[in-house]
Regions:
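Phosphate/pyrophosphate-binding loops at sites that engage ATP/ADP/AMP, CoA/4′-phosphopantetheine
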Residues: 104-113
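Active-site/ligand-binding loops adjacent to catalytic centers
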Residues: 60-90, 112, 137-140, 145-219
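A glycine-rich, Thr/Ser-enriched phosphate-binding loop motif common to dinucleotide/cofactor-binding enzymes
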Residues: 86-101
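N-terminal small/polar loop signature for handling phosphorylated ligands or for N-terminal nucleophile
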Residues: 64-65, 99, 103
Length: 219
């Protein structure tokens, strides 16, 4: 996607003297060149993925494929709340530092540890998961999530999974997916790197389905 997770992973691997291999869609390699150079400076090998739409979803597929082919010496590290359990849960808990900091900063600045509204963008869902994590069961807080509408949810050029998706399986997770009637994954469209994922983290699919979060498709 945008490459931030790749930079973070490359940094940790450099500190731990471990080999690091990053899979990134060729389209994203071009438009996020600065982050690619950071990864390389940290010693990571960056593999441009040239299949499909050459973006986030294709990079995830290649990373999982490589992991499955080399289980004896490879650990898969994903940066969003996607993939098979327990990955979505691990990522959400790690990202929950965002809402943890929100609580004490709000207490310090306004005298209470909760806001009226939380607003976050959502692609795979990691940043949004971290933002809302400690407030999910707090009904005083309204949750709004913004997903990329692309050219519009009534077109074939959109990444608004929670508006246009149906229940299915992508990268080992059962969630809302942009797919054809026979379950083939459709390509998501948006100019925003990191939001062009044709699925959504299961946590967000659940919250949206039961009305806990309000999802807006931003054009």
């Amino acid at each position: 996607g945008a490459g931030q997770h790749g930079v973070a992973t490359a940094t940790v691997c450099a500190l731990m003297d471990m080999k690091c291999e990053i899979f990134m869609g060729a389209t994203d390699v071009e438009r996020q060149h600065t982050n690619v150079e950071r990864m390389k400076m940290l010693g990571a090998k960056v593999n441009p993925v040239r299949t499909g739409n050459m973006t986030l979803s294709d990079a995830c597929s290649e990373a999982i494929r490589d992991w499955c082919c080399h289980p004896q010496d490879t650990f898969y590290i994903v940066g969003s709340t996607m993939g098979p359990h327990p990955y979505p849960d691990i990522v959400a808990k790690m990202q929950s530092v965002i809402s943890e900091e929100l609580k004490w900063q709000l207490e310090e600045k306004i005298g209470r540890d909760y806001p009226d509204y939380l607003i976050a963008c959502v692609g795979g869902g990691s940043n949004a998961a971290g933002t809302i994590y400690h407030y999910i069961d707090d009904d005083r807080v309204q949750i709004y999530l913004a997903e990329a509408a692309g050219h519009g949810i009534d077109t074939n050029y959109t990444a608004a999974t929670m508006h246009c998706g149906t229940e299915g399986i992508i990268h080992g997770a059962r969630t809302l997916v942009m797919q054809t009637e026979d379950g083939q994954i459709e390509e998501a469209f948006t100019i925003s790197a990191g939001l062009d994922y044709p699925g959504i983290g299961p946590m967000h699919a659940d919250l949206a389905t039961r009305g806990r979060s309000h999802v807006l498709a931003i054009k």
